[in-house]
Amino acid sequence: MQEIQFTLTREFIPLCDLLKATGVADSGGMGKVLVADGQVKVDGQVELRKTCKIRENQIVELGDVRIHVLPIDANEA
């Protein structure tokens, strides 16, 4: 399984934007399709809301990819 660590730059990121930002989806539109198809899990549960707010310490899974969402870097805030 591929593990990706993503550090937030603000309080949350919409799910479809996270998929695009991590390169899991080629575009925001593709991210929305993946979510709508029920292929994405957030903290182990299928998530169908395309703009679900993903916050620190959540885990997003798509196929064999797992994204760990890290808190905002205090040095950059």
Regions found by a protein language model. Give the residues of each.
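A detector for short, charged/polar N-terminal pre-domain segments
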Residues: M1-I13
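Intrinsic disorder/low-complexity signal
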Residues: Q2, C16, V42, V60, ...
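Generic alpha-helical hydrophobic packing signal
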Residues: T7, Q39, R66-H68
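C-terminal structural segments of small proteins and small subunits
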Residues: R49-A77
